[in-house]
Amino acid sequence: HNILASGYAGAIGGTNLQGETVLGIETVTSASDIPEGSYDMVLVCTPASSNIELLRQCAAKGIRAAFVTSAGYGEAGDAGVIAERELVATARELGILLAGPNGQGVVSTPSQMCAQIVAPYPPAGRIGVASQSGNFVSSFLNWSRATGIGISRAVSAGNAAAVGVADYLEFFATDPLTDVGLAYVEGIVDGRRLMNRLSKVSQDKPLVLVKGG
């Protein structure tokens, strides 16, 4: 619904166990039935146990980016940690850029795309948002709607298993449609390395960093 409501003009497809028409979109029962070369990215909302095979099916159809919203990974104990490592290894093997898992989605106003499972579509602007907390992204997008202060991109990094907040901020630093980066971080594994990377980012664009508990 959010993708359609934002006015995204690219090809949109979906899977559904019954193969029904959903919101006017024809669906297929399996990713293996997706027409080859039709899509660039898959938004994964299926159980963690099915996602390895799903990535393989998508890769076979030419999809090279995946945003995994599914929970049940590194935040879910030892078994989840193992599942997350397998997910990352599979994505790398297949040449798929992996965002998430356990994130809420991604927004790009220049592309009129709101692939976000919770938040509203914000007005266009020049702020790039990257957050470890999906709720922070949702709150900021609601604030953006309320104030009219627009954004360029927003991404909920989730567990950041393969791509983290610093990676998104480095992209914002080179993005001609973003003037300032806003980041929210909770857990930091290697603080010195993170600060070194953010220091380089701040040489190109202003950066606001919020550290949560």
Language model: regions and residue ranges:
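Catalytic-core regions of core metabolic enzymes
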Residues: 1-213
